Amino acid sequence: MQPTATAAAIPSGITLATTTPTGQTIPVAIGTRCFALGGTLAAILNKPDGSGIYGLIVADAAHDVTGEWGEYGQNVPNAKGPDGAANTQAMLAAGSPIAQAVRALNIEGHADWFIPSRLQMLALYESVPDLFDKDSWYWTSSQYSRYPAWCQDFEYGISTAGSKDYSFRARPVRSIQLQPFTPSQLPQPIAEGDPRAILGAEVAA
């Protein structure tokens, strides 16, 4: 039976935000295009350890990597969990060519890209299938056994095992921290006559 990817439950009326590398707090929602973060917020998930939630940023299709999963006939024991970043690191250590290509990416100053796990990929299918090519198969970072690894279809949502020596696409993603957001966190407009309007925002109110 195919597992179900359960998105994080966000209480009614709660807005989420993240912080950019420059320290700016920005509200986000599924489908938000975040140039400063390298792509589109595509899923909001519970952390595997239950310590909170996180968001998955999906890179544009132009950054897709195509190739073999690698390590055909080899067991990669640490590439079976729900954390795509940890799986990708295990693939990298084993010599996977697509893991090497994804980890070498630098998009908008971010170099922490990874291949999503099977569960993360299922969440992407549930939330943003239109960001993926319906005629392509996409590798996940989740190994099935020594010979196949899990791959994902975005036309019918099929998650199946494909031979590691097949050449499929891999979509880079990265994770971001999310926190509750209130409008007061946004920079407030400077009123007319405020000294900061003349001397600069660094002047104390």
Regions found by a protein language model. Give the residues of each.
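Intrinsically disordered, low-complexity, compositionally biased regions/tails
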Residues: 17, 27, 35, 42-43, ...
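Short aromatic-cysteine micro-motif
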Residues: 45-114, 118-119, 124-127
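Short acidic (Asp/Glu) patches
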Residues: 35-43, 95-99, 154-157
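GGW-centered surface loops in extracellular recognition modules
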Residues: 2-65
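A structural motif
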Residues: 19-23, 27-30, 100, 167, ...
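A broad, low-specificity signal for short, low-complexity segments enriched in glycine/proline
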Residues: 15-22, 73-78, 102, 133
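C-terminal, surface-exposed recognition/capping segments
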Residues: 1-9, 110-112, 118-205
